[in-house]
Amino acid sequence: MGKKLVMAQKRGETRALCLGVAMVMCAVITYYILGTTMLPLYQKSVWTQESLCRLIETNIRDQEELEGKKVPQYPCLWVNVSAVGKWAVLYHTEETRDRNQQCSYIPGSLDNYQMALADVEKVRAKFHERQVFYCFSTTQENETSVLYQRLYGPQALLASLFWPTFLLTGGLLIIAMVKINRSLSILAAQK
């Protein structure tokens, strides 16, 4: 009976140790991937200065063409704001600015024109509700655009690092518990 219990304990310890090592390895790989993809985007982001923006005007523009999409037309929102003591164009994120500089907000689904127009109208109404809001600007003097939301801000970086940290901590705890269990069983066998 005692020998079977020891064999089962060794198998269980081996499996737990393999699980802990696998969790640590997955965390290390994920940290590497995040370090080569997300961290450079965070470091290169120039939109670091948080400013207070005041709404000046909003326009819904139709018949805009989006490069790379098969959708011939879509509505887009154009927003002018006053930020850092000057007029600026507000963009939803960095990607919105890169996709089409004529649009402040591009709806997510471009398949149905009426749904896209309703989405743009809803966003426009929210801007008119809140005339003053926080936005992100750059420290460059000649820049005439600001962002409503940063894609690669500190919150996004911390959110992406949560699960690898959780995996690493869990894996190290499992490995530590197996090692403690082994040392306690050796001490118990010696008595």
From Swiss-Prot:
Q: What domain of life?
A: Eukaryota
Q: Which residues are glycosylated?
A: 80, 142
Residue intervals on the Cytoplasmic side: 1-15, 179-191
Q: Where does it localize? A: Membrane
Task: Name the predominant localization.
Answer: membrane
The Gene Ontology terms for molecular function here are:
calcium-activated potassium channel activity; potassium channel regulator activity
Q: Which UniProt keywords apply?
A: Glycoprotein, Ion channel, Ion transport, Membrane, Transmembrane, Transmembrane helix, Transport
Q: How does it assemble?
A: Interacts with KCNMA1 tetramer. There are probably 4 molecules of KCMNB1 per KCNMA1 tetramer.
| Annotated family | Belongs to the KCNMB (TC 8.A.14.1) family. KCNMB1 subfamily.
Q: What does this protein do?
A: Regulatory subunit of the calcium activated potassium KCNMA1 (maxiK) channel. Modulates the calcium sensitivity and gating kinetics of KCNMA1, thereby contributing to KCNMA1 channel diversity. Increases the apparent Ca(2+)/voltage sensitivity of the KCNMA1 channel. It also modifies KCNMA1 channel kinetics and alters its pharmacological properties. It slows down the activation and the deactivation kinetics of the channel. Acts as a negative regulator of smooth muscle contraction by enhancing the calcium sensitivity to KCNMA1.
Protein name in UniProt: Calcium-activated potassium channel subunit beta-1
Q: Which organism is it from?
A: Oryctolagus cuniculus (Rabbit)
Q: Which gene encodes it?
A: KCNMB1
